[in-house]
Structures are given as C-alpha cells and as structure tokens.
Amino acid sequence: GMALTLQPAHWPTNAAPSSYAIIAAQDAGGGDMGKLVHGILRACWVEERDIAEDAVIRDCLQAAGFDPALADSGLLSGAETYAANLERAVAANVFGAPFYVVDTGQSFWGQDRLGDLDLHLAGKL
C-alpha cells in the first residue's frame, strides 16, 4: 500500500520522458524493472515530484539499479520504441489501460476485466 496524493503538485505532467526511460532501461537490462516503475509512480503520486524532469528520472533509474545516464543516452531509443508501440496500439484499436489483445484478436480492457482475461487464457471463457 502506498499513501497516494490524489492531486499531486505535478499532475498532469508530461509522462513521455519517464516512459522513454522505462523502455531504455528494459533494453539495457541490469536493474529491477518493477522497482523502476514503482519508483516513478511513487515519485509522482507520493513524493509529488515531476516525473518529466531529468533529475527525477535519473534518481528513479539509479534507485532501481540502472545506469542513471540512461536518462540522457537512452531516451531517444526509448522514444522510437514508444512511437512504434503507439502505432501498433492504434492499429489494434487499443483505447485505454490496461488493455490486452489475445491471439484470437479478442480484447480485454480495464482492471475489472482481468478476471475475464484469466478465464479466457485458461480456456474457460
């Protein structure tokens, strides 16, 4: 459990730089992805830090065991992957998160549909 700030000081913000950093970290390896994503969410929703700022991104990368220089060197490749992912999502008619498209093309959207997704994957739906 995290004590969230429902109206953080820096929301809405530009989440793109943090998203690019997550992709760059995934490509680079060597750290803990779960800790990185949790750290970015915590920075925004608990610590009220601006996740669009390079210093915040560097801190989150370093705390999760990644090279903080990815905030500089990796963002371009992260942005390219992000754009490609966005194009694929639009082509698949994705319109929210979480959103899952299974091999049959059936879509599951929303936290409240994860149980249905589990049933589908188990062959029970």
Language-model-detected regions and their locations in the chain:
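Structural alpha/beta surface segment adjacent to cysteine/selenocysteine redox centers
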Residues: 1-44
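C-terminal cap of thioredoxin/glutaredoxin-like
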Residues: 39-125
